[in-house]
């Protein structure tokens, strides 16, 4: 039996995606609020830095594991303000999360030029060489087969297309590392219980962060998927990192 991690638990590979879907379906309506509370608002600064990695907004952009649409809607607003002709596709395997993204897009009057697709990051329903940019923020660690998702990213990007990933990473500074670990395992699940009534969902999220590869390990995985010019930039002492790479 092919097993993988669901948090710290070992589960059958074929069951992980369903378990992850349940986590996000259960927290979808409070997802944005929880992001603010868990990160003390820092996730907004991280995402602002993330979208700065896309200099050309006259592009076809695929946002995978789009969730409630934060990245795509930031890009859509930036493009509208600059009168750029952007094409944005939001893809997520969880329909409940995409419903939140659609609602936000309508509320912000940003629905134009947006497409929504329910799809797995491991099996994207797009032809080869379709997009100029592939973005994924805080999503790739939830994919059952990360290597397969990276190869799919490489496939759907045009030649010299850019892969950009924002993900929780490994803190190296001792005092920050100790505080961060205590906060993650003790405070975040308690906030989840208080706000969402679901401590277990946030225990999983914390555990998935703990098990995610280090910056250098993930860099090698990206390179092995077929990318070139692979690099990363740490933010907030390595709490998160922005990984980037290009297709040949």
From Swiss-Prot:
Pathway: Quinol/quinone metabolism; menaquinone biosynthesis; menaquinol from 1,4-dihydroxy-2-naphthoate: step 2/2; Cofactor biosynthesis; ubiquinone biosynthesis. It comes from the Bacteria. Keywords: Menaquinone biosynthesis, Methyltransferase, S-adenosyl-L-methionine, Transferase, Ubiquinone biosynthesis. Belongs to the class I-like SAM-binding methyltransferase superfamily. MenG/UbiE family. This is Ubiquinone/menaquinone biosynthesis C-methyltransferase UbiE. Its EC number is 2.1.1.163, 2.1.1.201. It comes from Rickettsia massiliae (strain Mtu5). S-adenosyl-L-methionine binds at residues 68, 92. Methyltransferase required for the conversion of demethylmenaquinol (DMKH2) to menaquinol (MKH2) and the conversion of 2-polyprenyl-6-methoxy-1,4-benzoquinol (DDMQH2) to 2-polyprenyl-3-methyl-6-methoxy-1,4-benzoquinol (DMQH2). Gene3D superfamilies: Vaccinia Virus protein VP39 (3.40.50.150). One of its GO terms (molecular function) is demethylmenaquinone methyltransferase activity. It catalyses: a 2-demethylmenaquinol + S-adenosyl-L-methionine = a menaquinol + S-adenosyl-L-homocysteine + H(+); a 2-methoxy-6-(all-trans-polyprenyl)benzene-1,4-diol + S-adenosyl-L-methionine = a 5-methoxy-2-methyl-3-(all-trans-polyprenyl)benzene-1,4-diol + S-adenosyl-L-homocysteine + H(+). One of its GO terms (biological process) is menaquinone biosynthetic process. InterPro entries: SAM-dependent_MTases_sf, UbiE/COQ5_MeTrFase, UbiE/COQ5_MeTrFase_CS.
């Amino acid at each position: 039996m092919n097993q993988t991690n669901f948090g710290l638990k070992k589960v059958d590979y074929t069951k992980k995606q369903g378990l992850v879907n349940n986590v996000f379906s259960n927290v979808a309506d409070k997802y944005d609020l929880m992001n603010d509370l868990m990160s003390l608002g820092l996730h907004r600064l991280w995402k602002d830095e993330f979208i700065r990695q896309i200099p050309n907004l006259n592009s076809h952009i695929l946002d995978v594991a789009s969730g409630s649409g934060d990245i795509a809607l930031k890009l859509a607003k930036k493009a509208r303000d600059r009168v750029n002709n952007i094409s944005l596709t939001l893809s997520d395997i969880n329909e409940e999360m995409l419903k939140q993204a659609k609602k936000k897009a309508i509320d912000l009057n940003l629905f134009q030029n947006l497409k929504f697709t329910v799809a797995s990051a491991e099996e994207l329903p797009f032809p080869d060489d379709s997009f100029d940019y592939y973005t994924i923020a805080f999503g790739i660690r939830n994919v059952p087969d990360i290597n397969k998702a990276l190869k799919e990213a490489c496939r759907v990007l045009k030649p010299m297309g850019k892969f950009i990933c924002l993900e929780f990473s490994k803190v190296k500074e001792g005092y920050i590392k100790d505080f961060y670990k205590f906060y993650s395992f003790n405070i975040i699940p308690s906030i989840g219980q208080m706000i969402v009534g679901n401590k277990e969902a946030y225990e999983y999220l914390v555990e998935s962060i703990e098990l995610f590869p280090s910056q250098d390990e993930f860099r090698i995985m990206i390179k092995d998927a077929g990318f070139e010019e692979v690099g990363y930039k740490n933010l907030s002492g390595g709490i998160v990192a922005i990984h980037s790479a290009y297709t040949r």
